[in-house]
Amino acid sequence: MSKRRIAPLTFLRRLLLRILAALAVFWGGGIALFSVVPVPFSAVMAERQISAWLGGEFGYVAHSDWVSMADISPWMGLAVIAAEDQKFPEHWGFDVPAIEKALAHNERNESRIRGASTLSQQTAKNLFLWDGRSWLRKGLEAGLTLGIETVWSKKRILTVYLNIAEFGDGIFGVEAAAQRYFHKPASRLSVSEAALLAAVLPNPIRYKANAPSGYVRSRQAWIMRQMRQLGGESFMTRNQLN
């Protein structure tokens, strides 16, 4: 009887290990491949597209146009760093002080959860994982973030982030956002336009770049101040990000 009970458990354990090994190979290959190859689509884009089809929205198209960092305004990269991750050039994927502050805040305010994800973590999640909050996803995100930080340069992380970030319903990547909202290529985005796009992150479905609320305008102004305090374009050059 004991052997019959152990056999299914052994089978499940081996199956789980094989699945994890397969995922590790898949994600590792993806990290290596996308260190040099443009990203055609992300996990979040696929998730949005499938959800739309399942909901009967057959006209929905998750749209993205890949562009190199040379074809993105330096203000855009600076804007997302100022808004989301000011220690981006310094850390190895995790901003520990920010995480500690977020945990302390969340213990006091369970109804208003604050995140502390870096641009590297957001890139790993958007590219390979799914939306939602769970310890499983955060654990996988941590491993993928370490892989990305080990293999990719900071400039590459920022390039991929800007090309797969969600800026509105079906709008992925800064080129698609620039064309949709400002009718110009991403290379010509101004300081204020870049700050406005960064202001709707990381919740571009709730906050609209084409119909900014008072909160979004206030955040846009704050981001522009932070961009100046970081040093403007010289920050990007100094940290080899453009």
UniProtKB/Swiss-Prot annotation:
Keyword Cell inner membrane among record annotations: yes
Substrates-to-products reaction catalysed: [GlcNAc-(1->4)-Mur2Ac(oyl-L-Ala-gamma-D-Glu-L-Lys-D-Ala-D-Ala)](n)-di-trans,octa-cis-undecaprenyl diphosphate + beta-D-GlcNAc-(1->4)-Mur2Ac(oyl-L-Ala-gamma-D-Glu-L-Lys-D-Ala-D-Ala)-di-trans,octa-cis-undecaprenyl diphosphate = [GlcNAc-(1->4)-Mur2Ac(oyl-L-Ala-gamma-D-Glu-L-Lys-D-Ala-D-Ala)](n+1)-di-trans,octa-cis-undecaprenyl diphosphate + di-trans,octa-cis-undecaprenyl diphosphate + H(+)
Name of protein: Biosynthetic peptidoglycan transglycosylase
Gene Ontology MF terms in the entry: pentosyltransferase activity; peptidoglycan glycosyltransferase activity
Organism from which the protein derives: Salmonella heidelberg (strain SL476)
Function summary: Peptidoglycan polymerase that catalyzes glycan chain elongation from lipid-linked precursors.
Pathway linked to the protein: Cell wall biogenesis; peptidoglycan biosynthesis
EC number: 2.4.99.28
Gene3D superfamilies: Biosynthetic peptidoglycan transglycosylase-like
PANTHER family membership: BIOSYNTHETIC PEPTIDOGLYCAN TRANSGLYCOSYLASE, MONOFUNCTIONAL BIOSYNTHETIC PEPTIDOGLYCAN TRANSGLYCOSYLASE
InterPro entries according to UniProt: Glyco_trans_51, Lysozyme-like_dom_sf, PBP_transglycosylase, Pep_trsgly
Record NCBIfam families: mono_pep_trsgly
Keyword Cytoplasm tagged: no
Key words of the record: Cell inner membrane, Cell membrane, Cell shape, Cell wall biogenesis/degradation, Glycosyltransferase, Membrane, Peptidoglycan synthesis, Transferase, Transmembrane, Transmembrane helix
